[in-house]
């Protein structure tokens, strides 16, 4: 299960098709382009809205090849022979694989790449977006700022590649909607605080660890080995008492750990969903949160009940998409479900071979697999 909360951040719908455009329908402000709903599976892209391949898998997919979801600009990050590049919605290389690492394109049409230990931002033509190079570069956020590293320090750049906040921090998070970003500037003490848009300390660096502020004005932080929640003045709204804590979701619940188990607390620090779970993710806009118990993972509703039964080895967040990736417990192969837990498309093993099945459990790849299987 992915842990969305990390020291340095690199990186919905309840029904399946209605909000996604047909491939031939122009995207509008309310209708996203069709390729945003495509699912990368077995080296190809499956379109749930049409229940058909948008881009068919290759005849022979290599194990280390990767195909990532399409960005809004119609380009998808892809890996071939150990190098990253970008393909278009026909599956053709728009930017040939040449990078050691890379990110998907952001909404400002820029992507972060690294080659020969040097990081640059490129445009949709694969050209360098600006002259400045970096030790490490990350995706642009909705605030049009990106975290970038110069030597061993981090700062923020704008969409023109200029330093908005000079690189002087040893660790840093993206800015939260309230305009504050968790940061640490001293490698000796590793104390965390919060900076404002000018890079000045809004909340002094005096915490062992600090997380992002949520819409309710609270942020998780730790002191004395325990986690609690700060208000926007840096005071404890919920005193440190948890083994771990994560930012609040939009529904007002934050996951927290006690005695090695995870549950969910409200803004007063009271348990709303008791600590039953071995692993837990944040609640999403569709009201679901991934969780794991006794070795199996599923999705909880806001009452703490299993909305989608714990039946998978691993589950991933929906991330505002109409589908989520899961790992099947019987085969350890990936599959994709909707917010009701129904299969959209999945890999399976038949006759000793890996195949792709649709929602009706029909083999859709390889196309002539059934006849070949019958002969064995």
Predicted regions and their residues:
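Positively charged n-region of N-terminal signal peptides that target proteins for export
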Residues: 1-4
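Bacterial N-terminal signal peptides
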Residues: 7-15
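Residues in and immediately flanking transmembrane alpha helices
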Residues: 15-16, 351
């Amino acid at each position: 299960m992915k842990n969305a909360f990390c020291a340095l951040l690199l990186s919905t719908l309840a029904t399946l098709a209605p909000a996604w455009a047909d491939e031939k329908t122009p995207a509008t402000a309310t209708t996203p382009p069709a390729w945003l709903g495509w699912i990368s599976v077995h080296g190809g892209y499956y379109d749930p809205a049409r229940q058909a391949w948008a881009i068919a898998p290759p005849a022979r997919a290599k194990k280390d090849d990767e195909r990532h979801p399409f960005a809004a600009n119609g380009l998808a990050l892809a890996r071939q022979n150990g190098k990253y590049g970008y393909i278009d919605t026909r599956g053709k290389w728009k930017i040939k694989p040449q990078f050691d690492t890379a990110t998907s394109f952001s909404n400002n049409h820029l992507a972060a790449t690294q080659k020969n230990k040097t990081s640059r931002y490129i445009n949709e033509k694969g050209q360098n977006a600006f002259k400045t190079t970096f030790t490490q570069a990350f995706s642009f956020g909705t605030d049009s700022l990106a975290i970038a590293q110069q030597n061993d320090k981090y700062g923020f750049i704008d969409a023109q590649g200029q330093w908005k906040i000079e690189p002087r921090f040893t660790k840093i998070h993206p800015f939260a909607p309230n305009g504050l970003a968790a940061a640490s500037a001293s490698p000796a003490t590793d104390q965390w605080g919060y900076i404002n848009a000018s890079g000045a300390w809004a909340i002094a660096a005096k915490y062992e660890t600090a997380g992002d502020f949520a819409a309710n004005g609270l942020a998780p932080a730790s002191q004395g080995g325990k986690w609690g929640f700060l208000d926007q003045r840096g005071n404890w709204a919920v005193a440190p008492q948890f083994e771990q804590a994560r930012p609040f979701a939009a529904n007002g619940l934050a996951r927290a750990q006690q005695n090695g188990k995870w549950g969910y607390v409200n803004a007063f620090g009271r348990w709303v969903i008791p600590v039953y779970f071995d692993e837990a993710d944040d609640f999403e806009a569709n009201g679901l949160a991934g969780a794991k118990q006794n070795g199996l993972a599923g999705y909880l509703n806001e009452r703490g009940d299993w909305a989608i039964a714990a039946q998978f080895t691993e589950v991933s967040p929906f991330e505002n998409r109409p589908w989520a990736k899961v790992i099947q417990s019987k085969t350890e192969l990936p599959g994709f479900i909707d917010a009701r837990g129904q299969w959209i498309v999945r890999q399976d093993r038949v006759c000793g071979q890996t195949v792709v099945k649709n929602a009706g459990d029909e083999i859709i790849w390889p196309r002539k697999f059934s006849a070949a299987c019958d002969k064995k």
